[in-house]
């Protein structure tokens, strides 16, 4: 008869009594339905049993102070914590209840006499989180339907809802009658709806966003309640059994009990089948009774599961939607965890990865249970979100707050104001602003753009480099080093490290230019013309957009000078440095100074001919230093000579004001981008001791590098903005949810206050009417 009421996928029922766990095949029409019987720890009573999500493993716990795992074929998978392992995770307590997480079987929670809720990682056999707050024995624990919260009840009548994201107590409630709470069940579909029951027979329906029960059935049972649960198919249907030999079903929509079924023995446990109408109850004399709540209030069948002296302490059905595992070819770990191990439900990730990174370490216990991750210099954590313009690879992910950041969150709502740390403060605290880093750049190309990760830490390891290097160079770098001087003036083009020839970035020689060392040795000994001594930089490191734009625009009228180079340098500098106009505005002021400050300006005697001539150029903020001696100015001349070479046909006598120079460069840059690219590709000759060398291969390489630079910057920026937009969207949504939750709580409180005010007003109106009536009677008598 039972074969018509259950499906093959969840036909097995686990039951515990005394120190034994038994599995029953309720679909068997004849013969012994018990398919397996085992004793986890002889002599130790079993208090709770649960099926995992694959329907292949049963977890049980009790007075043996551990969680035992058994496959349905009778094979033991060990215990948690591991027997004999001295890792500080020993339970050292009698466990009353266990519960798997809703999304998978890797994590299981437990509670008992230790007054602490523990979350165990069954893959690593370790306790990864401890949730405190109770002051008495914990009798029930359970995850909510979204694995966001974990509720627990205790003998002291406390109901605590723990936030798994922060580890904080989201809600602390107390039974209104002060009864001993022993039972707890969460709704299968509502995140904040749960039911509790205890020793005085009262059943409470709670909305955990409020401060009091949403609904109560006071002393429904005349003896302690032994079991309570929601219907899996309809959260408005609740069932409970008690030691008064009664089984009640409730309809929360009508606020009353809908049926009552009596039995010959006291009940001791209860479980709903996944179809929503098969109800199984255990009794104190070892029986397991099956009911169909749609039919007559009589048992469908009764199993003699245990002896008459043993209570059926716990019941658990298999799930109707198990995680599919190939039973012909699977390991013990697959039987326990499934074919794929789910992400951590202890700390939800704002941007979860589809596959765990190889550089991530396993989750370690901590104050917030955050999975510690290590970010290598050659690889960054990836996110599956991709932009349609960035199909070639994943983007660097935005990181939320890590475990070492201190803040308390009641509902795990991510806030961009609270959770995102300041980049400048972070760099100062790590000492990066005092580090000499301008000469060599070994960072990967994904770190060349600060906008892709600004405001987010790259991981818990503070020793890793940060993209702040690309836009905030050190003020204490060596000014006498010509390479340091030129490496402070940057370009958007990703440049290879001068010390890393096997870098993944394209080296300058691949673009058609010479190595930095060769060019430096060649140009350091050249003599410079003094025809432009009236033009000078305000300091030794004044390689700013002023110099770049002036050197390009001064020779724009000459047919022999490659105009596109100056424009390209100005465009590149403008793209990377938003405040380039602040530096370029100093040109007019500097041009009016006397020629005694700088006898010759080598920067303007020779134009830069190719982007490959210099390894890396970065902009330096040191623009205020003045020269005090003639020797210092001469050394400055040598510092600038390594990146400068003049086109042979350029006319050095053309002079323009700073405003004209900027206007002309900007007009060429904005109005003729195609011409700039074409000119840059075809008119950038390589100089070697005054000789002109040019080839078709060099032109193609330069054109390819320019297009690659623009596309790389555009796609990286678009991908970063897309990820940031998604993050902001999630933050706003979470904020709206939090606002609604707070509004609901205040609404409940205000409704109670208003109802009490209305009651007082009604009483006062009655008294007023009585007084008027008495007043009229007195007037009539007088």
UniProtKB/Swiss-Prot annotation:
* Gene Ontology molecular function terms on file: gamma-tubulin complex binding
List residue spans for each WD repeat: 1-34, 41-80, 90-130, 133-172, 176-216, 220-260, 262-301, 307-358
The effect of disrupting this gene, in the record's words, is: Lethal when homozygous. Compromised asymmetric mitotic division in dividing microspores resulting in abortion of gametogenesis.
Region (Disordered) location = 350-393, 467-512
What Pfam families does UniProt report for this protein, alphabetically?
A: WD40 (PF00400)
Residue stretches of biased makeup (Polar residues): 352-362, 370-386, 488-498
Q: Which residues form a coiled coil?
A: 753-782
PROSITE patterns associated with the record: WD_REPEATS_1, WD_REPEATS_2, WD_REPEATS_REGION
Superkingdom, natural source: Eukaryota
GO cellular component, alphabetical, reads: kinetochore; kinetochore microtubule; microtubule organizing center; nuclear envelope; phragmoplast
Which Gene3D superfamilies does the UniProt record give? YVTN repeat-like/Quinoprotein amine dehydrogenase (2.130.10.10)
| Protein keywords | Centromere, Chromosome, Coiled coil, Cytoplasm, Cytoskeleton, Kinetochore, Nucleus, Repeat, WD repeat
GO BP, one annotated term: regulation of mitotic spindle organization
The entry's localization annotation reads:
Nucleus envelope; Chromosome, Centromere, Kinetochore; Cytoplasm, Cytoskeleton, Phragmoplast; Cytoplasm, Cytoskeleton, Microtubule organizing center
Could you tell me in which tissues this protein is expressed? Expressed in root meristematic cells.
Functional summary from the UniProt entry? Regulates microtubules organization in a centrosome-independent manner. Required for the spindle to be positioned correctly and for the function of gamma-tubulin in organizing phragmoplast microtubules. Component of active gamma-tubulin ring complexes (gamma-TuRCs) associated with cortical microtubules in interphase cells. Mediates gamma-TuRC recruitment to the nucleation sites and is important for determining the ratio of branched to parallel nucleation. May mediate the localization of GCP2 and GCP3 to the nuclear envelope.
Q: What is this protein called?
A: Protein NEDD1
| Provenance organism | Arabidopsis thaliana
